[in-house]
Amino acid sequence: MTLSAAQRISCDVVETRAEVARIFNIQRYSLNDGRGIRTVVFFKGCPHRCPWCANPESISPKIETVRRESKCLHCTPCLWDVDECPSGAFEPIGRDVTLEELVNEVMKDDVFFRYSGGGVTLSGGEVLLQAPFATQFLQRLRRFGVHTAIETAGDAPLSRLMPLARQCDEVLFDLKIMDADLAQSIVAMNLPRVLDNFRQLVADGINVIPRVPLIPGYTLNETNMARVLAFLLPSGIRQLHLLPFHQYGEPKYRLLGQEWGMRQAIPPTEDEVSAMRQLAEREGFNVTVGG
């Protein structure tokens, strides 16, 4: 999906609604977004345009309405009204929650956190668009002893990122296209700022876990991986997560009535993933596929 400059959102714009967040999903019992059993809160809105995005419903900060054809009775005339639809075919994507509501919602899973050593992960979208709320939210959870994490691309002013990161036990930090010009033109990302923010978090003693999506045609190549490793080596970090491309997001594009440019892309083979893994392991990295 291509958006005009006027339609795009930016993490440089300060979000002032620290008491309300816009989310689109709460996923329970996750094993892939940090340690233990986790509850993942997906925040709505993203400033980037990754062609491989598996959550296209996360991109717009607005609450969207979709129609599930399997439920549609094909009434005439159709009002496209969530409240009036007799079959429930229309559903909103996105809702606003207060700090208290969200704390109460995720703390229903506290027994699983304590049993497994898990906790809460904030994902998106890009959580940095709603950093003031997210920071307060994680502060509250830490008072209950909940393990906290965020998933982020790190492309925001450090003044927004650092206060949130300091409330995290883990920061799952994506490193994508490692060429500054390509990162800007393909995904609308300020790579120099991303890399500087990564260094600043590490220098502050924050537990940063770098993650690399392995995307055919974009990041699934030795050149990009070599740049990732060259960047990470001076930091002392030796943990790395590799995230192979998948097609799980394709039905979401259809639901939104959008064409997905990666629909014909083939997920990496085991040999291709293994080759990237071996590159990192030869440099002394402890590699996890998935995570």
Q: Which residues does each PLM region occupy?
A:
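Auxiliary Fe-S-binding modules of radical SAM enzymes
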Residues: M1-R35, L214-G291
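Active-site anion-handling motifs in enzyme catalytic cores
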Residues: V97
